[in-house]
């Protein structure tokens, strides 16, 4: 089994796969990445370089390829799938989910899922026209980017030029001179966001309890499960998540692939109670780290089992915490330049119902997510406070 991307999420999936007897090689753009520290072997390469990726496939001859990042030469994934390798969840799904245009067309125009009003643009003039149609304020994003890169909120026509420039500079790796298409969509009256982890396996498709979240500049900072919402919101969220994943899996199966794995379906809940589709991550989701404290099987264990063809039923995705309680996660982001040394860990974990996962990334340059605090509490506020206290109690030195 070959991992493309060896971050903290891949590390947890690698551990779960090895518990089930899988042999794992973890690849990334640098040595010492979290999953590389626990895998049987590792490789370092530019995964967006088709020649390097093809050479890696020829060397390893993987039975299963697990993309854990988006900056990958997807043409080589498709070629590997054509040669008989199992790409997780599929080469076709990976290509769709990294392209906002293809994903939005599938979700809204083919599957009929509700979304914000949107337009696509391949030039500054088209962006101006699209923004006029969807109205201000609006959001402009590159077709291909992640973690909020290249995204901006535009409140008037005067800011459109700057938004176009931001999108071009923040898009995924590209050749100099290329122009990236963008999506411009109406800024919805958002109440909150949800993630619905949805699992496709040999037994079909099941959904986990929705996860609440807090973000900063497009990056996950906190999550909690189960989130609090009305029965109507739950029904809408589960329907949208299941329909989106069913549509993606159908695309995979049409190309002869399996489509098995965990999907993080991102949803907007509006102030009027309506739920909109936003995006899908075809792999375990950042916000799903809370499942290490909340579920019988974490999103990582579910992903590993689904990949290997084991059946996942609703019983496998059940919460493991006492009824009425809530689990929370709190990302620990470190700023500086050098190696991070964690101190005061014993005091930070003194409160019952708390835990910590240190990712052991080699260095920090600027700011980087280096660990996550976990907690179980009597309600959402209690769980979030306990996880936050763990994060605040740590003494993290840059050495």
Swiss-Prot record:
Record-listed Mg(2+) binding positions: 266, 279
Pfam families on file: ATP-grasp, PurT_C, RS_preATP-grasp-like
Binding site for ATP: 100, 141, 146-151, 185-188, 193
Positions of N(1)-(5-phospho-beta-D-ribosyl)glycinamide binding: 8-9, 68, 286, 361, 368-369
A single BP term in Gene Ontology: 'de novo' IMP biosynthetic process
Entry keywords, A to Z: ATP-binding, Ligase, Magnesium, Metal-binding, Nucleotide-binding, Purine biosynthesis
Domain ATP-grasp as annotated: residue spans: 105-308
This protein's pathway: Purine metabolism; IMP biosynthesis via de novo pathway; N(2)-formyl-N(1)-(5-phospho-D-ribosyl)glycinamide from N(1)-(5-phospho-D-ribosyl)glycinamide (formate route): step 1/1
InterPro entries named among the record's database cross-references: ATP-grasp, ATP-grasp_carboxylate-amine, ATP_grasp_subdomain_1, PreATP-grasp_dom_sf, PurT, PurT/PurK_preATP-grasp, PurT_C, Rudment_hybrid_motif
Catalysed reaction equations from the record: N(1)-(5-phospho-beta-D-ribosyl)glycinamide + formate + ATP = N(2)-formyl-N(1)-(5-phospho-beta-D-ribosyl)glycinamide + ADP + phosphate + H(+)
EC top class, as a word: ligase
A GO molecular-function annotation: phosphoribosylglycinamide formyltransferase 2 activity
Cellular component GO terms held in the UniProt record: cytosol
Organism domain of life: Bacteria
Enzyme Commission designation: 6.3.1.21
Disulfide bonds: none
Subunit note: Homodimer.
Family the entry assigns: Belongs to the PurK/PurT family.
Function of the protein: Involved in the de novo purine biosynthesis. Catalyzes the transfer of formate to 5-phospho-ribosyl-glycinamide (GAR), producing 5-phospho-ribosyl-N-formylglycinamide (FGAR). Formate is provided by PurU via hydrolysis of 10-formyl-tetrahydrofolate.
Protein name (database record): Formate-dependent phosphoribosylglycinamide formyltransferase
Species: Bifidobacterium adolescentis (strain ATCC 15703 / DSM 20083 / NCTC 11814 / E194a)
Lineage per the UniProt record: Bacteria, Bacillati, Actinomycetota, Actinomycetes, Bifidobacteriales
